[in-house]
Amino acid sequence: ATITVVNRCSYTVWPGALPGGGVRLDPGQRWALNMPAGTAGAAV
């Protein structure tokens, strides 16, 4: 499954995911997270 995080704010945000880390998202940018089948414990 893919989860897409979209920054709809007018400012930069720094979303994070566990496990994995985080990224910088400027306004309008997207971050696609590919979740392996069977993932049961994750947080964004």
UniProtKB/Swiss-Prot annotation:
GO terms for biological process: defense response to fungus; killing of cells of another organism. The keyword Manganese does not apply. The keyword Glycosyltransferase does not apply. Keywords: Antimicrobial, Fungicide, Plant defense. PROSITE patterns: THAUMATIN_2. It comes from the Eukaryota. Has antifungal activity. Inhibits the growth of Trichoderma viridae and Candida albicans. Belongs to the thaumatin family. This is Antifungal protein R. It comes from Hordeum vulgare.
